[in-house]
Amino acid sequence: MNIIFPQTYFHHTTISNVDDLRNLKIDESYNVNWAKACSVKVEGLFVDDLIPYIYPVVNNFLKRANISLENFELMQPWKNTYEKGGFQELHDHGDSFLSGCIFLDNPDPDFGNFYFYNRHAVELLKPQRQLLSNLFDSPFLSFVPSVVKGDILIFPSYLMHGVTMHKSEKTRTTISFNIDTL
């Protein structure tokens, strides 16, 4: 089997000092105009506060592709707080280059799950999806990465993703961000 046109990927690693991220200053000027189709508390964070945590991870990821971090910048990051019943609708960040999510809590069985969705799955008949799923021993429609507190995911911004309904009484908190080209 030859694989052509690989375009869906994500980078999964862990950052240290994740507890420090819980107490970052909130940017009160952050204008959230995109959260109408979901149920999540969104608060802007300051870029400079996140750079020490995010840039080393992004730099290591880009180095694998012989790409320099100096051609990119971290855009306005934000904190997501999910209460019981909260969710994030399926979406992408199509105007950016890379997107990411940092998980601030250990998972609970009733926590909402971050997931990736293959937007191209609908282009194939069910037998074709099954064939691809079996050949590559991986899901073809959606994928839920296994994450724990301190994990960070980096993925292309065009990759569809969301968060399933949060059913726990405990809050679920993440930090999201985009990386754009200069």
Model region roles, listed by residue range:
Residues 135-182:
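Catalytic core of Fe(II)/2-oxoglutarate
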Residues 69-71, 92-96, 167-171:
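A generic structural micro-feature
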Residues 1-70, 78, 85-87, 113:
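Non-heme Fe(II)/2-oxoglutarate
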Residues 78, 91-93, 161:
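Histidine-centered active-site/metal-ligand motif
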Residues 8-10, 97-99, 142, 172-174:
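Intrinsic-disorder/low-complexity, polar/charged segments enriched in Ser/Thr/Lys/Arg/Asp/Glu/Gln
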Residues 83-154:
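Catalytic core of non-heme Fe(II) oxygenases with the double-stranded beta-helix
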Residues 77-79, 100-102, 175-179:
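A structural signal for short, well-ordered beta-strand segments
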